[in-house]
């Protein structure tokens, strides 16, 4: 029922979301469709008869003292996704189930040392929870799996999946065992993980902690632990319960959901192109290499920018190069995610046309692109205002080349003695003198002509 989970103060809190007396829950149809879409994309079996249960527990972020969830008949079961790690390992990770539930509030622990705050803005917000099989054996595999799920969900439009904002969360259950041991060890659950890097560090930290306990002859306690990424350590929050401790029973206020074949067919027909299909199309339709196609589709937002820029400019390889080289460089410098890019695709398309039509050269274009990237500048207006158009006045270029050659007689002599690299130096100095605005082909031609003719 809550319209959003992001706000200051309890601005989005509703009576039904916090279980106020007299309020009754209402099923959000959209979350059912999102759950079906994700389940289909993750190769799940759809439960065409599913229902809701109450998970009973007391905690400050849960004013109802129960959470509406699905234990016995979740919407999806028995799925899988294929992953590939950065080191090249390929494997299939099973999905035990996908269920729908309502979100709890958010506890804020780091504002004051002696108390915690409770934010109920996200209480009652519908979410889907993906329960994974214990198939992953390293932090690298976990990150590859989460990245795969994030891309699926983003491409489906079910969520923007921003960990730092809480629209995607991951609780990591981890245990260790001796090599060859048939049974899993005692697991702990790690919370407060708001980035993939934090997840990887938490996994490594908890792995070391559990191994140290066992090597010292102590037991691992089944508990929920809170990860502190600044200290790179965790502390116990509460004991970890099993399902029977929550005293699940069917929610009496919500009727079962019957999912017809026709409903599934409608959801399937609306499924958008996912990353795997997009990679194949980029290679076939645009002639992009595998690496380029993978990088451009590693974010739905990046793929959208690429496709729209290509549509406007008609130059897929140029659009790809600007995004893969310059945009990636600037994102790294500013510690940005692809989803943070906000410039207009029409501006990037205009820049591509300006380079193609030799209105500006590539050196200047890089400067202009930075303005587009940082401030969404109109490239045509920016070039005009700053006098950055390519200088094609042969007389002015010839005079500049002569001045550069006169200032560098040793390079002129080196070239005439057979050292071809000296010409590159003179071209570079000319471009520098022209502040990058000269036509490189004209500069090359004039330098070669003047060196050959001895007219310096």
Feature roles, as predicted:
Residues 166-178, 283-305, 316-333, 346-348, ...:
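Core structural elements
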